[in-house]
Amino acid sequence: MYNYTHQKYIKTMVKVCLYLKNKIRTSYNMKITISKFQVLFFVLFTLSACTSDDEKDISAECSPIEKGTKIMPLGASRVQGFPGLFESYRYELWKDLIDGGFEFDFVGNNEDLWEYASYKNYCFDNEHEGRGGWTAAQINDNIESWLTAVGDVDIVLFSSPGGNDALDGADLEDIIANVNSIVDKIQAHNSNITIIIEQLAPGKTSFMTEEYTLLFTQMKTVVTQIASSKKTATSEVVVVDMATGFTDGMLADDIHYNQAGAAFIAERYYNTLVPFLD
């Protein structure tokens, strides 16, 4: 997509390896352990695949959109994604919005460490606010500084609220308090903002214990109540149902999306977003 040199490519791979070794944590507090050997193997394997044809592919000319409605994808690993292991909905939603003819700009302080293919001569907009393994409590502690750093935000896509908290064993009351506080802080940043908040898609059937299933069901009701109570004359808070119709076949592992899951979530977001886009 961009005119990468070998030096920039190697730098990117080093960042990815550090991310894998030190930071990556799948959603719901499940850690991935990577040895030094695995990291080294990953670097060598990736660099060995870097042929001149590959360079041509990633340096294909494309242009950013970066204008129009500013949309912040907010959440944890389901927002961040990690291609090759599991997918984010963002790339599929980005393509859907291009197909719809909308002008928009994904915003956030995080940028992907990997490349996505260009689409219709546009470069993928890789900015987001997805942080793997983070809880609503952690997001609540940081959302104000993130919003300040980004500046203008018109729409927030609030993914899987309370999901990681639940798997960390947090009390429902604490989850509710943190999600409410996040919404309050977003609206304080922009009193005219639109917030689209998920009724989260479930994990794999074999993974959903009785305790998780109960909390999952409770959170569906909680999200509806929060949206209703936080809506103002100038700020819409809209629920999007990601649970109905979501199946085990849409998961790459116990809780993360595969390609089909990412496309499903993107379509739900797209249909909810359209009335709020210029």
Task: Give the label of every model feature segment.
Residues S159-N164, V183-Q218, D241-A243:
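Active-site segments of SGNH/GDSL-like serine hydrolases
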Residues Q38-S48:
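Bacterial N-terminal signal peptides
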Residues L74-R78, V107-D112, F158-G163, E198-G203, ...:
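Active-site-proximal beta-strand/loop segments in catalytic clefts of secreted hydrolases
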Residues R78-A177, Y212, T217:
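Conserved SGNH/GDSL esterase-like catalytic core that processes O-acyl groups on lipids
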Residues P202-D241, Q259-A263:
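Substrate-gating cap/lid alpha-helix
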Residues K67-K70, G100-D105, G151-L157, N190-I196, ...:
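Loop/turn elements at helix/coil->beta-strand transitions in domains of secreted/extracellular proteins
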Residues T46-T69:
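Bacterial Sec-dependent N-terminal signal peptides
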Residues L74, A252-D278:
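Histidine-centered active-site loop/cap adjacent to the catalytic His
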